[in-house]
Amino acid sequence: MEVDLPVHNEYDASRFHQVTIRDPIAGADSTFTIPTRYVNLSFLNAGAQGTVVMADDLVTTQRVAIKKMQQPFVMTMSAKRAYREFILLTTIKHPNIIRLLNAFTPDTSLSTFREVYLVMELMTHNLHEVIHRLRLDHKTLSFFVYQSLCAIKHLHNSGVIHRDLKPSNIVVNDRCVLKVLDFGLARKKNVDTSMRMSDYVVTRYYRAPEVILGLPYSEKVDIWSVGCIFAEMINHTVLFPGKDRIDQWTKIYSVLGTPDDHFISQLGQSAAMYVRSLPRHQARAFSEIVPDTNFLPETENPRVHLTPHVARDLLFNMLKINPEERYSVEDALNHPYVKLWFKDDEVNAPASENRYDQEIDFADKTLIEWKELIFNEVQRYQADHDIFTG
């Protein structure tokens, strides 16, 4: 539904208009105050971080996605996430990372500032929808994993760990081009990760063992997440569907087996005692975890290593409980199952400039201070870009 509403006096009515969009899932309305270049809005999806619509851009004549950040200034945590996502989207650039086309606020002063909008390239589906609607052939499985790895390699080279990879944060189009989005939980690689991550609320199913058990973590948490997503693409079900943190660990070790003493010795005292108190499990064979019957046999191509056996070998090395034994992103990109797609300009693209200040993750800022930081960044973006006709 598209309805023009009276424009708030704070907005420039010659440049902005208001459109109310109905969320058919939640049964709620959301009002978008956007430049007049964007018309024909329709609901795309909604989540904890915001509402996303499709729109026509009259300037570029392209269809775009517009995300209205969901109440970014209600809590400190949501404001921090909004700031982090805004900075990273404006700086990280790679073919497999969603591209920011425009960003703006209709609010003209800090005192009235309450809305932030991000305009991005439109992708037709998220990976969650694809996984649960289609059986994917080997070529598509391989291509999706390759592109996911290219995206996280670029993030890692740019000093960023995504930390929240999951099917709903990955989008694809009808040409099977894949892009990663949602950087609200991303963090710089070289911060102190030995402390517990108070704001690390990545979807539990894709959470690495070292995070669950309170160990320091590295960029290999992203490899674990891609491995879980890869298995889900094959099986069409979540690999480790834990009900809570403890059950998540139970699901993992009951499939992959009890870790060795070297790994357990690295845990804190209480975590080590807990892990040792559990019944020991032998690892299940990966031929049981992702059986041949879950692949499309007619799409195998042994000449380029597109077989269940080779796919399982990649998965086996991505889903190591001990991150020291787990594949790096470079290891994974050189694996036969995905190497057929290797393009140097995709795999080794120059690192993006990263203006995100790692120290700000630990800064004790008030909600008003976070709001001012975001306002200043949006104003900077608007000063550097023509948001109305550029």
From Swiss-Prot:
Expressed in somatic and germline tissues. Residues 38-338 form the Protein kinase domain. It is found in: Cytoplasm. GO terms for cellular component: cytoplasm; nucleus. The active site is at D164 (proton acceptor). Its main location: cytoplasm. Its EC number is 2.7.11.24. GO terms for molecular function: ATP binding; DEAD/H-box RNA helicase binding; JUN kinase activity; protein kinase activity; protein serine kinase activity; protein serine/threonine kinase activity; RNA polymerase II-specific DNA-binding transcription factor binding. Induction: By B.thuringiensis pore-forming toxin Cry5B. Activated by mek-1 mediated phosphorylation. No differences in basal activation between larvae and adults. Inhibited by phosphatase vhp-1. Keywords: ATP-binding, Cytoplasm, Differentiation, Kinase, Nucleotide-binding, Oogenesis, Phosphoprotein, Serine/threonine-protein kinase, Spermatogenesis, Stress response, Transferase. Belongs to the protein kinase superfamily. CMGC Ser/Thr protein kinase family. MAP kinase subfamily. Mitogen-activated protein kinase which is an essential component of the JNK pathway composed of mlk-1, mek-1 and kgb-1. Phosphorylates the transcription factor fos-1 which prevents fos-1 dimerization and promoter binding and results in activation of target genes including F53A9.2/kreg-1 and lys-3/kreg-2. Phosphorylates jun-1 and activates the AP-1 transcription factor which is a heterodimer of jun-1 and fos-1. Phosphorylates glh-1 in vitro which may play a role in controlling glh-1 protein levels in the germline by targeting it for degradation by the proteasome. Interacts with glh-1, glh-2 (via C-terminus), glh-3 (via C-terminus) and glh-4 (via C-terminus). Interacts with csn-5; the interaction may prevent glh-1 degradation induced by kgb-1. Interacts with fos-1. This is GLH-binding kinase 1.
